[in-house]
C-alpha cells in the first residue's frame, strides 16, 4: 500500500499521467494532426492509385513506427517518380534560395500542357523532382472556378536541366496516366523582368495547320529560317485534346517577323500550307474603341433613333456569337470569309453586304466566336488586314430593315492573348499573368 501510495504520490507530484488517462495533445500538435487529416481528405481528388499513395504517406507521418518506406515496395518499382509527393512540401521552403539566373536569354522555365484536372503542383513537381533541379512549379487555374486550365510551368535551377527534361520527356507518358507529356519552352523565366511588355509584340498567327503539327514542329519550321524565333504554340482544344488547327509564333526580331509574314504565308508545315498573319496583342484591345465610329460607317447604318450607332453590343449579351469583320477586300466572297473562320467551330452563316467593306460571321456558339476573334483579329484575309469585334446578334434586329440584322458595329474587340499570352488556355506567358 505504501508503495502504491508512494507511486500515486509520485504521480501527483511529478505531474505524470496515470496509465488509464490521456493527456490532450498540445495545440501545435493538434493543429498538425488537423492539417494532416485535411491533406488526407484532399488526396481523394486524385485517381485511386495516387490517392492511396498520398494517404499512405500521411499515415507514415503520423505513425512512422508502423510503416516501412514505400519506395521499397512493389508500387514504387513500377512508379519510381511518384514517391516524391511527400518531399514537395519540404522542397517549397527551399525554392526561394539564391539562384544564379544568368542572362536575360537564359530561360529556364518549361511550359507543360494537356494536364488532367487532378494534376496539381504536387504531381507536376513529382514528375521532375528526381533531377534535383526544380526551382518552382505553378499550375494555372481559372480565377472564378479555381479549376486547372490544363497547363502549368516548371522552372529549373539551370537551363541545362530544363533542356534535358524537354528532350527526354516530350511525348513520353506521364506517371499514373495515359497522357503523354506536352512540353515547350516558356516565353519568360520567372526570374526575368518582362521589359518587353512596353515594347512591340512580335508574334504571328499561323492558321490552317495540319492536325499532326506540334509545338516542336511549328517551332522548327520557323526557326530554321528565322533564328530570332523564341517560341511556338499550337492551340489545343481543352475538351478533345486535339489541335484547333492554328497557333502562334513569337519572334525576337521585328525584321524577321515582317519577312515571315510574307515568306511563310502559303509555305508548308507538315503536309498543309500555312496561313500567316499578324497576331493582335492584348494591349491593342483598348485602341479598338477609337475606331468604333469608323466601323459604324463601314456598316453603313443608323440606329433606331437616327444616330450613327450600329452594333454596339452590350457586354451582357453572353450568348451573342456574331462577329463583325471590318476592312474586307472588295473581292472577298462569302466562302473566302467562311473558310478561315470555320476552323474555330460551326459557322451558321456568313454575310458580306455589297459595297460596305465589311462582313459578318455567325457561329453556333459563343466560345467558337471568342476563339476566332482572339486568333484572326489583325490577320490577312484576301488582300487586306481585317479587324474583328462583336457584331449584333441576329435575334436583335433593327426596326425597319430586317436585312440590317447583320449590320453589327465595331464595339469591344479581343486581342489574341486574352490574359497575357499567346492563346486562350495554352500559353506560356499566362504564367506571369495569373495570380
UniProtKB/Swiss-Prot annotation:
GO biological process, one term: stress granule assembly
Classification via Pfam families: RRM_1 (PF00076)
Localization in the cell: Nucleus; Cytoplasmic granule
Gene Ontology MF terms in the entry: mRNA binding; poly(A) binding
Domain of life: Eukaryota
Tissue: Expressed at low levels in leaves, stems, flowers, and seedlings.
Subunit structure: Interacts with the poly(A) tail of mRNA in nucleus.
Residue stretches of biased makeup (Polar residues): 1-15
Residue ranges of every copy of the RRM domain listed in the record: 108-188, 202-281, 321-393
Region (Disordered): 1-41, 85-104, 392-412
UniProt record similarity statement: Belongs to the polyadenylate-binding RBP47 family.
Cited SMART domains: RRM
Keyword terms: mRNA processing, Nucleus, Repeat, RNA-binding
Statement: the UniProt record of this protein carries the keyword Nucleus: yes
Induction / repression: Repressed by ozone-induced oxidative stress.
Annotated function: Heterogeneous nuclear ribonucleoprotein (hnRNP)-protein binding the poly(A) tail of mRNA and probably involved in some steps of pre-mRNA maturation.
Composition bias, Low complexity: 29-41
Full protein name: Polyadenylate-binding protein RBP47B
Keyword Repeat: yes
GO terms under cellular component: cytoplasmic stress granule; cytosol; nucleus
Amino acid at each position: 500500500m505504501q508503495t502504491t501510495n508512494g507511486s500515486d504520490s509520485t504521480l501527483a507530484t511529478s505531474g505524470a499521467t496515470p496509465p488509464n488517462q490521456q493527456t490532450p495533445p498540445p495545440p501545435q500538435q493538434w493543429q498538425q494532426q488537423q492539417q494532416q487529416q485535411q491533406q488526407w481528405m484532399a488526396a481523394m481528388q486524385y485517381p485511386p492509385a495516387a490517392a492511396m499513395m498520398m494517404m499512405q504517406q500521411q499515415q507514415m507521418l503520423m505513425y512512422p513506427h508502423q510503416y516501412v518506406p514505400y519506395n521499397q515496395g512493389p508500387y514504387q518499382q513500377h512508379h519510381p517518380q511518384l514517391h516524391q509527393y511527400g518531399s514537395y512540401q519540404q522542397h517549397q521552403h527551399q525554392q526561394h534560395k539564391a539562384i544564379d539566373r544568368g542572362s536575360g536569354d537564359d530561360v529556364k522555365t518549361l511550359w507543360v500542357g494537356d494536364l488532367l484536372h487532378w494534376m496539381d503542383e504536387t504531381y507536376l513537381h513529382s514528375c521532375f523532382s528526381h533531377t534535383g533541379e526544380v526551382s518552382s512549379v505553378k499550375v494555372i487555374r481559372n480565377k472564378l472556378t479555381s479549376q486547372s486550365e490544363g497547363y502549368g510551368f516548371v522552372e529549373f535551377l539551370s537551363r541545362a536541366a530544363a533542356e534535358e527534361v524537354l528532350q527526354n520527356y516530350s511525348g513520353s507518358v506521364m506517371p499514373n496516366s495515359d497522357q503523354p507529356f506536352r512540353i515547350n519552352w516558356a516565353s519568360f523565366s520567372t526570374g526575368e523582368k518582362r521589359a518587353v511588355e512596353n515594347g512591340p509584340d512580335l508574334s504571328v498567327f499561323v492558321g490552317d495547320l495540319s492536325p499532326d503539327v506540334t509545338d516542336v514542329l511549328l517551332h522548327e519550321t520557323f526557326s530554321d529560317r528565322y533564328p530570332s524565333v523564341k517560341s511556338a504554340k499550337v492551340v489545343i482544344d481543352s475538351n478533345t485534346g486535339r489541335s484547333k488547327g492554328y497557333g502562334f509564333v513569337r519572334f525576337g526580331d521585328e525584321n524577321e517577323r515582317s519577312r515571315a509574314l510574307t515568306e511563310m504565308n502559303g509555305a508548308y508545315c507538315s503536309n498543309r500550307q500555312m496561313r500567316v498573319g499578324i497576331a493582335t496583342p492584348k494591349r491593342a484591345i483598348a485602341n479598338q474603341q477609337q475606331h468604333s465610329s469608323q466601323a459604324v460607317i463601314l456598316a453603313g447604318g443608323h440606329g433606331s433613333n437616327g444616330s450613327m450607332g450600329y452594333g454596339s453590343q452590350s457586354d451582357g449579351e453572353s450568348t451573342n456569337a456574331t462577329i463583325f469583320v471590318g476592312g474586307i477586300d472588295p473581292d472577298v466572297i462569302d466562302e473566302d470569309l467562311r473558310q478561315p473562320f470555320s476552323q474555330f467551330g460551326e459557322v451558321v452563316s456568313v454575310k458580306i453586304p455589297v459595297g460596305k467593306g465589311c462582313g459578318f460571321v455567325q457561329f453556333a456558339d459563343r466560345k467558337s466566336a471568342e476563339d476566332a476573334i482572339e486568333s484572326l483579329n489583325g490577320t490577312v484575309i484576301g488582300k487586306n488586314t481585317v479587324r474583328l469585334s462583336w457584331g449584333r446578334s441576329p435575334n436583335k434586329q433593327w426596326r425597319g430593315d430586317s436585312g440590317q440584322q447583320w449590320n453589327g458595329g465595331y464595339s469591344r474587340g479581343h486581342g489574341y492573348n486574352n490574359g497575357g499570352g499567346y492563346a486562350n488556355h495554352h500559353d506560356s506567358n499566362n504564367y506571369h499573368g495569373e495570380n
